[in-house]
Amino acid sequence: MRNFSLSASIILIASVWLMLCSFTPYSDADLFSAGVSEEDLKTLKEDVIEGQTGVIMLSACHAQIEVPEGFLFLDEPQARKLLIDYWDNPESNFDDLLGVLVPDDNEYFLQISVAFVITYDNCGYIKDNDANSIDYNELLETLQKDFEENNKSLPEGNRCKLKGWTVTPHYDQSNHVLIWAKTLEFSSGEVVNYDMRILGKDGLVSINAVVNPEDVDEVVSKESTMVQSISFDKGYAYADFNPARDKVSDWTLGGLVAGSILAKTGVLSKLGLLLLKFWKIIAVGAVGIVAGLKKLFGSKKTKE
């Protein structure tokens, strides 16, 4: 399988800027135009997904997911296969992976072009008393300055610009859900990182996706369905927090938006975006793409 996963990675990297995380599965024509051979495609089509629907228990975080209509849930092993073998993410990026949601018109791994990655961070109870006091415009300006500063140490072609909020951060106080999206601009195009955080008493469930800017409206239309699909078990919801017994997190809502724990919350690196560490976001997408191509094509030449 590993040989074909490498081929898949080459295809995805080569075609990514043409079909950036679209909700439409890759067609045979798309894959042929990206360089996959008819023989390889035939074999890769045999690597079918086993998606689940209905209510699925997420025992690792004492929660469950009711799979939204129009989607399939891929369990942790299949999610790792997609994210690591097919999309060439480092395995260490997904220590807390629960699964992924993919559109239900996908049949095999290679044709999946977008996924909502679900992870859990056992970081403790995050207080939301700063929800109404955060100036997100000021936060954006700070982050943009950090991007500019970081770009100074990167080659011009590898630089990334934080254009702004695609979806302004907003917190649903009644359901304890934090949502935002930001647009990142690379020399080859733009991507949108879409983030949803569902808070519980012991930590948070994160739903993340990297999407085409043109598909943001579609994600927004599914936003409520996505977050409502996750529910914590009795005794583990946000309202069940007991200060005498439960751990309080050092994180704040503002810290989550700033990117303090992005390294733990499953941001996809499908497009060459590396997982981000600590609060200072470092975007090196072009470097990842170039390195991935060199590694994959280098491996191919060696085998030949």
Model-assigned labels for residue ranges:
Residues 1-10:
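Bacterial N-terminal signal peptides that target proteins for export
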Residues 10-20:
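Bacterial N-terminal signal peptides
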Residues 28-64, 72-193, 235, 247, ...:
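Conserved polar/disulfide-associated segments of primarily extracytoplasmic proteins
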Residues 53-66, 214-224:
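Short aromatic-glycine motifs in intrinsically disordered, low-complexity regions
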